[in-house]
Amino acid sequence: MARIRLVEHAAGAPGLRWFGLGPDLKPSRGLLKLRRLLHKHAFWAQQRTTADLKRMLAGSTVAVSLWRGKRMVGFGRATSDGIHRAVLWDVVVAGDLECRGLGWRVVGALLSAKAIRNAERVYLLTTNRSGFYQQMGFEPASP
C-alpha cells in the first residue's frame, strides 16, 4: 500500500485552488479530486461546485489534505481569528480508509496550526461523528 502523505496548504490554499497542486507542489488536479472526495464521501457536500470549493478554500485559514499516491483520501479546513475562536469544517476521509487514524491525522494537523492552536476555543459541527470528536476531547456544546 502506498504511504499516505499530509499536505498542509497555505492560508486560502492558493496552490490547490488555482493550480490543483498536491504533494510535492506538483499539479495533480487537486481541486477536481477534492470535489470527487466530497461528493463521494460527504453527504453534506454533494452539491458543491468547483466555484463553491474555490470560494470555500479562499476563506479558509488552514487547509490540509491527505494523499495516497495521486488520490486525495482526506481533507479538512478551519477558520479562525487567531486568538479567540476557531471552527473546524469539512473534515472527510475516504470511506474505504476509515478507522485507520486518518481522521485523527487531519484533525491533529488542523489543531496544531498556529492560527488554530492559539485560539481560546475551537468549535465544530458534526451530523453523525460526535463519538469520533469526543474521543479527541471535544465536548457537546451546552444550550
Feature annotation, model-predicted:
Residues 48-92:
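A conserved beta-strand-loop-helix scaffold within acyl/acetyltransferase catalytic domains
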Residues 97, 101-109:
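Conserved acetyl-CoA pyrophosphate-binding loop and the N-cap/start of the following alpha-helix
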Residues 116-143:
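Conserved active-site alpha-helix within GNAT-family acetyltransferase domains
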